[in-house]
Amino acid sequence: MFRFEEPTVEDEWLYFFKRAERILKEAEARKGQKPFNKPSRLQYISQHNFLKGVAGEEGGSEPGKRTDRLLTNIAYNEHPPCIVPFATLEKKFLDDLRLEMAHRGSYILLRAVVDPNNYVSVTTIAEDENGEVELVEIYNQDGRRSPTSIMPEGQVFIVKEPYFKTTSHGGPGIRVDHVSDVIFLDGEDERIPEKWRPRIRLLARRSLDWKDDGNRFYKGKQYFEAAQW
């Protein structure tokens, strides 16, 4: 009888990469199609929050216990950034997106419905104006900033020429590799739909509220956040 041996960490990562490679290669056969068996809004958000609870924003697990992670970025079928003026782009919605395609000549307007998870990318669940939701992975952001300061719940943003693809885990998502392909909208930007504008909430805040928030962030050494307030 052969003695059973527990798989090593190297074995587990080899399996992960082989599985991801197979998923991404098979995804090419669905290029131009809409995703099937797409998760519901509740399923998207529940899975996102579950992963946040497992990994934690900084990758920890149990209090006082260190968890080492190997961060991976599997880039398959890379695409160039958008280089045309924004004014020439046509607005699209999530239902218009097709798998394994960078939607040239288009843009999509989204709003984050959860606080982000932090892997190699800043990962969130976002909705369009029709209430449809999708996973969004934004790469190459400033590593000195907390993910929540980049993409807090409620943040409205634009993705230019969105690249809609199958992720290495097998589900659909929008992948943003180029920092110039995402535009974060603030305050009263005219591109924000009226129903998404935080005008009433912001006007109701007193100047002391802004000051207190700024001081709190500064004391916590969250300097980017403090500067915003």
Question: What is each model feature region?
Answer:
Residues 1-65:
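Eukaryotic non-catalytic protein-interaction modules, chiefly N-terminal intrinsically disordered
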Residues 53-107, 113:
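Short boundary/loop segments of OB/S1/cold-shock single-stranded nucleic-acid-binding domains
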Residues 99-105, 109-141:
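OB-fold (S1/OB) nucleic-acid-binding surfaces
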Residues 116-119, 132-135, 143-147, 165-168, ...:
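Eukaryotic short linear interaction motifs
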Residues 125-132, 150, 154, 165:
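N-terminal accessory interaction module
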Residues 140-160:
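Short nucleic-acid-contacting surface segments enriched for D/E, G, S/T with interspersed K/R
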Residues 160-201:
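OB-fold/S1-family single-stranded nucleic acid-binding modules
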Residues 202-229:
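Alpha-helical segment of the N-proximal tetratricopeptide repeat
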